[in-house]
Regions:
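Phosphate- and other anionic-substrate recognition elements at nucleic-acid/protein interfaces
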Residues: 1-105
Length: 105
């Protein structure tokens, strides 16, 4: 399995969509996690992996939590994510949003 270097996260009420890529930008993981499993999953990420999420109220909580674990976190402004989302992805859904956040980071 390729080593994950960057993760895009779309936060929702009950689940968190993750889109992880390797150093070449190839998708390694694209799946949903229950909110309760997200922190456990992030703890297993390789050192130096970047976790990016669209800036919103819940993102600040997760950013603080992950940074306390030594994980590099980047909050991406929503207008920047929209620009990537519009580049050929059809429709707005959690998977497309997570991929757009990953690319924008």
């Amino acid at each position: 399995m390729q080593e994950i270097t960057r993760v895009g996260v779309d936060l929702a009420k009950n689940v968190i969509q993750i889109h992880a890529v390797d150093a070449q930008g190839k998708t390694v993981i694209n799946r949903q996690l229950p909110r309760g499993k997200f922190k456990e999953w992030c703890i297993q990420l390789p050192v130096g992996c970047l976790v990016a999420m669209e800036a919103c109220g819940g993102a600040h909580y997760w950013a603080r939590t992950l940074r306390s674990l030594g994980i590099e976190v980047r909050l991406v402004a929503p207008h920047l994510v929209t620009a990537y989302r519009l580049q050929g992805k059809s429709g707005k859904n959690d998977a497309n949003d997570a991929a757009a956040v990953c690319e924008a980071a």
